[in-house]
Amino acid sequence: MTKSHPLNLAGEPRAFFGRRSGKRLHKGQDQLFRDVLPALTIALPERGTLDLAALFPGARNFILEIGYGGGEHLARQALSHPETGFIGAEVFSGGIAKLVQQIDAEGIGNVRLFTDDALKLLVKLEPATLDAVYLLYPDPWPKTRHHKRWCRVLGQGSG
């Protein structure tokens, strides 16, 4: 596996089309990356699956948002539903910085972040552990063959 060609679920190289960085982070964002982001970042276990209950003690539901951009939707949902554990998966450093800034400023405690390819996260989740997945502005647009990836981790009746 190389950085430019991560592996897909079948172990074959696949292309990544999103940007990982844009303009340079300003001093305040850089400090948030150093001081705040590490506590929010999800570290995947080498073996086994990710324990969402341990990440979010007391949470009744778990929701994943993939490609959250600036994080406006994710932050609003997290503030509106404090009983839910939210995972945001994003690779773009500008979007990550913007959301971390908002999490820090508003004291949002029910959000954890994954800052790599969401596919790596999906394969570490137990089947039927998520109550919903938000994919609001997909790039590239999802294809029918991608459906099996979401169905495996969504609980029955989830949407």
Sequence positions of predicted segments:
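A short SAM/SAH-binding and catalytic strip from SAM-dependent methyltransferases
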Residues: 130-150
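A short glycine-rich, Lys/Arg-flanked "PGG" loop and its adjoining helix->strand segment in the class I
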Residues: 151-159
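Conserved SAM/SAH-binding beta-strand->alpha-helix loop
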Residues: 92
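S-adenosyl-L-methionine
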Residues: 1-64, 72-79, 100-127
